[in-house]
Amino acid sequence: MNAGDVYRLIQDIRAEFGTTKKIWIYTGHIFEELTGAAKQAALASDVVVDGPFIAAKKDFRLAFRGSSNQRIIDVKRTLDAQKIIELNV
């Protein structure tokens, strides 16, 4: 599935459920570097897990991410603060 498809899927979920469903996406890319449809999809979601999975940084104790370089970003709070706000999970 490409980023444009993901963005349209998020729009469909929002149309059907409003904000009653939390939408998480995993990008494999750095949040600040996203462009185009990938950026649209990220900004339309509630939480973004960014950064590539790096096997050398794998940590099974981490919740919702595979390696310690990945961030769990609260999108709304990040947009409001105009800086990255990570969720502590």
Give residue spans per PLM region.
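Proline-centered loop/turn at the N-terminus of a beta-strand
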Residues: 21-22, 47, 71
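Gly/Ser/Thr-rich helix-start
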Residues: 29, 52, 67
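P-loop/Walker A phosphate-binding loop and immediately adjacent motor/lid segment at beta-alpha junctions
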Residues: 1-14, 58-89
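Structural recognition of alpha->loop->beta junctions
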Residues: 36-57
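Residue-level detector of flexible, active-site-proximal loop/helix-junction positions
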Residues: 30, 55, 79
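Short, conserved loop/helix-junction motifs that constitute active-site signature segments
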Residues: 18, 40-43, 66
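Conserved Radical SAM active-site core
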Residues: 1-25, 29-38
